[in-house]
Amino acid sequence: MGKVPFNDPTVEELLQITEEGLRKYLDPAVETVLTVGNYIVGGGGKRLRPLLLLLFAKGLGVPQTILLEKTLPLAVGIEYIHTASLLHDDVVDEAETRRGKEAAHRIFGNGVAVLTGDYMYANALYLYALYGNQKMIEVVSQAVKLMAEGQVLELKKVGELIDEGTYFQIIDGKTSALFAASTAVGALAAQQENWQIYWDFGLKLGRAFQLIDDALDYEGDEKQVGKPIGQDLKEGKTTYPLLSVLENLNLEEVKKVLSSPNGDGYKKIVLLVKELGGVEKTKERARGELQAAREILNKVPLNGEVKRMLNQILDFVVERTY
């Protein structure tokens, strides 16, 4: 459940200043908001999104002093947005745990969790108003819109057997959009006008990240993943491992499981999906997205050291077990 596991001094430094920034810029006047904020921020996380933002900015030439003074708050803002989405998602999903700990809403209540999430969103936009520019605000706001749309679409499709197009529409919104904003803002911080290509990189990385998340839901270690195996299917959600082997399954049985949340029928489907190769097919699709991301990396003017680190991150995304 921890951060990106690299023994690279540059990555370690960027992760360290991110942690310091997350504490520094979380300064609400109401103690309860601070308590909940510290609980969720202190609960761990990979910090991939802020790391990507800082790496792109650094690799495209942002000086260290500017990186610390003006770019770091933008990276922190991205992580606040991610944190806010987790607070809200756990309330919507009635989740019991998050990152191996009891979900915030179960400790502090739904109302406090939701409103703290609202504060985190507002604080992120405040940081962008102070340290960013108009285009950055547009990019991040668009990502938040897409996140909300993806979450609503997923919620409306619970209990239904969706097609592949709808699946990618959901994950491009709920997951990929914030990765895309992270890499695009990093490029914008370095005065790159063609920010869309950096958005596309983040989008493909985000797709791969969610695909692996969905694979881990079928075969991961519960302690490492931080939630029970088969949880998505149990909640009535169709994800790629299931879609990839659907032609070999009894559709009526699958539909019955999806439409009966929290029953026990999902366990049989989880085993069948694994036996039919659904997990490996999902990982293969993720590798395809990452290959497309690598091709983008080869086209952009990043320095060699940062390009190497980003390729390591792409390796981590597909090989991770949490």
Q: What is each stretch, according to the model?
A:
Residues 1-322:
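All-alpha prenyltransferase/terpene-synthase fold signal
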